[in-house]
């Protein structure tokens, strides 16, 4: 398979609203999986907490981490608002996610980070 970048990524909804639960949790999970698949990004582990998302992913070298995250957060915002139009009123200006994200490359710590998700 060649070189891939394994990253631990954390990002949150705007205003850290505790929105990721129930029907929204399943829908947001489907959207994020679909968008990762479209870009050839493999999800090793993922955890949807009420106010943020953790993902352990392999990103192909043709994608930069920042361009992938821009795509993931931007496109998923549009898809979330299409599926759940009522959320537009809480978030305004079509941005579901807050600015920025946390990322750390995994390297030799992959097993320890995977254990965190379990």
Report each predicted region and the residues it spans.
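Basic nucleic-acid-binding interfaces
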Residues: 1-118
């Amino acid at each position: 398979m060649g070189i891939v970048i394994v990253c631990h990524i954390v990002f949150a909804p705007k205003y850290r609203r505790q929105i990721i639960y129930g029907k929204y949790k399943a829908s947001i999970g489907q959207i994020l999986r679909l968008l990762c698949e479209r870009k050839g990004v493999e999800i090793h582990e993922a955890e949807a907490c009420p106010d943020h998302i953790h993902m352990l992913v392999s990103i192909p070298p043709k994608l930069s981490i920042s361009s992938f995250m821009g795509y993931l957060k931007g496109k998923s915002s549009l898809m979330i608002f299409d599926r759940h139009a009522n959320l537009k009123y809480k978030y305004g200006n079509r941005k579901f996610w807050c600015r920025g994200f946390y990322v750390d490359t995994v390297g030799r710590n992959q097993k320890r980070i995977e254990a965190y998700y379990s």
